[in-house]
């Protein structure tokens, strides 16, 4: 699972 900050980066 990806963190909230991870998906905002891509």
From Swiss-Prot:
Belongs to the FARP (FMRFamide related peptide) family. This is FMRFamide-like neuropeptide FLP2. Its main location: secreted. The keyword Disulfide bond does not apply. GO terms for biological process: neuropeptide signaling pathway. Keywords: Amidation, Neuropeptide, Secreted. It is found in: Secreted. The lineage of its organism: Eukaryota, Metazoa, Ecdysozoa, Arthropoda, Crustacea. GO terms for cellular component: extracellular region. It comes from the Eukaryota. The modification Phenylalanine amide is found at residue 10.
């Amino acid at each position: 699972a990806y963190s909230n900050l991870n998906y905002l980066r891509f």
